[in-house]
């Protein structure tokens, strides 16, 4: 399973949307309707799943699913 597929599944579960509707270009807030609480929960789950730590200031720069995937791949 690729990083994208794992992230896609986690986001789909958290936001209760179809995994098929999530692409790397999907914007977390604008397209997927994530609010700040959703984003924080997703980040905590991603940190646990991938064994990484996401700094608070970085979270603001993670706008799309692709941004999240690239960050994880670069920090694993």
Where are these regions (language model features)?
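Phosphopantetheine-dependent thiolation modules in NRPS/PKS and related acyl-activating systems
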Residues: 2-34, 38-43, 48-49, 53-76
């Amino acid at each position: 399973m690729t990083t994208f597929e794992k992230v896609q599944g986690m986001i789909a579960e958290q936001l209760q949307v179809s995994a098929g509707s999530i692409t790397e270009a999907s914007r977390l807030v604008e397209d997927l309707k994530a609010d700040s609480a959703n984003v924080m929960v997703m980040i905590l789950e991603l940190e646990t799943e991938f064994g990484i730590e996401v700094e608070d200031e970085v979270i603001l720069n993670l706008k799309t699913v692709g941004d999240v995937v690239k960050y994880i791949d670069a920090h694993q």
